[in-house]
């Protein structure tokens, strides 16, 4: 899918149409870029193992190559498939805050840190599961611009540059996820977002 026009499919955020989800998953598998709703902001999904798709994702967003991409998952087994293992503190956070607006950084077998997030949004979870490939998804906007909370906002910034947008209405939270590194002890918050540091500190030690 490489047209100059971005397709839009409306989906019920609670009961998304299976055909729309399948269409989005197919676009991702084929190397396309798909805007989709999460509970925080709209994400821009790409096949993590497709080099051309990742190159295009960085180019479309005008994103610095030094900024890593978060892996979005629909179940915990996807963490191990990505070459990582949950730490003890990570398990505690996942149990209490996933699905939800929390990105957890883990260290891979090769020593590289990878962020994981399980969004609390039915459209997102079904799209990730149906893709059957590892999915990365930064916010669906030009870098430095306000993250979009609606399909219209995605199209305003990236219309004609991406392949598909699944329009699931306005996002519920509207604030980006909190990012925490649990590969170190005590854990370190890299970005405070929808979940406040003081809330996380009730569950694990934070620097």
Locate each region found by the language model:
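Active-site-adjacent structural elements in enzyme catalytic cores
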Residues: 1-207
